[in-house]
Amino acid sequence: MRAERMSPLLALGLLVSGLCSRVHCLPENVTPEERHKGTSVDGHSLASSNTDFAFSLYKQLALKNPNKNVIFSPLSISIALAFLSLGARGPTVTEILEGLKFNLTETLEREIHQGFQHLLQMLSRPSNELQLSVGNTMFVQEQLKLLDKFREDALALYTSEAFSTNFKDPETAKSLINDYVKNKTRGKIVDLFKDLDPLTKVILVNYIYFKAQWRTPFDPKQTYKSQFHVSKNKTVEVPMMSIGDLVTPYFRDEELDCTLVELTYTSNDSALFILPDEGKMQDLEAKLIPEMLTRWRESLYPRGIHELNLPRFSIATDYKLKDILSQLEIKKVFTQEADLSGITDDHELEVSQVVHKAVLDVGEEGTEGAAATGVKVGITSINNHIPLSFNRPFLIAIVLKDTQSIIFLGKVTNPSQA
């Protein structure tokens, strides 16, 4: 009987690394106009669903990891699960796509995949202002034959490579996959998989590497040691970056008791830093919805900031998402009821785990050999008496401008913890 079998396993590995640094790199061949043109309404609809999924997943991760740093890439997870859904059928595919916050009564499944195809094409455009690598890869057990339709769609829609792998030798397979991942993320992600089950048949990997430079850099000489208030009873010493007389998008949200500042990169992408008032973090987290992000973006307006203080930090996280995704109603794919018959003729395939590893560095360090120039804008006609210090837990969202995709989302509770 099906209930008594030992299920062949499919694992998803999700990995992402990002660095936010200070060097102003001048474009050589690609103009901002060339990079940004082509964004469609469909792309914004996709971004809306991805944002809804991002906030839902964030709430679960924050709930499961109280008083800890939370950093993940909703974009990476969305792409990987959408990729997986290519091979899902029946209630399994419905759960995955609805869990990703798509309305299947309004949007055809094929249109969703075409939306991700367009998104990946946008992300793959070359730029001298931004280092961004996104890819999908399949590691397939030797002798296992993928269905032609799945292989073709995986390549056409998700530009996925496929590598034959001997999972019956789990140590060798693990080294192969981890080395591949390490190479694709410039050494930032190591040991994505700690161990592999010899019953594994397929591993789907999505990776994202992101590195950008601040449009207006921080001066390392201005970085100083300062106290960060992790909680009422705990403070830690952190390197605090500082910049004065800065003009940047700013918004004071009296309704949600928080302050926002947006720092842009030379690529016009941006990092949104959200500082709740003392004791208001949980209230803010409970109200995270896509409409709130839209309201924030519409309300941000350039203001003069007398002094901005932001901790320099490097945070790494490692999550197993099976239980958390189940809370978002993505369940069947992890059980013997999974229908992944669109991947292979082996109809007893199921997902064993979704592993996500993220690394995010925010600092003033630059790229070796690049030009290190940043331009400050004069603010004589703008109120420049606003001081802002991120010296207690705050939220961060890194948004790609041309697709409105959240590439990173998280909470910095303790910048001193790697």
UniProtKB/Swiss-Prot annotation:
A cellular-component GO term for this protein: chromaffin granule
Subcellular location: Cytoplasmic vesicle, Secretory vesicle, Chromaffin granule; Secreted
Keywords: Cytoplasmic vesicle, Glycoprotein, Protease inhibitor, Secreted, Serine protease inhibitor, Signal
Keyword Oxidoreductase: no
Residues forming coiled coils: none
DNA damage keyword on record: no
Predominant subcellular localization, coarse grouping: cytoplasm
Signal peptide: 1-25
Pfam families documented for this protein: Serpin (PF00079)
Entry's Gene Ontology molecular function annotations: serine-type endopeptidase inhibitor activity
SUPFAM superfamilies: Serpins
Glycosylated position list: N103, N183, N233, N268
Highest taxon in the source lineage: Eukaryota
Annotated family: Belongs to the serpin family.
Function: Serine protease inhibitor.
Subunit (UniProt): Homodimer.
Protein name: Serpin A3-8
Species of the source: Bos taurus (Bovine)
Organism classification: Eukaryota, Metazoa, Chordata, Craniata, Vertebrata
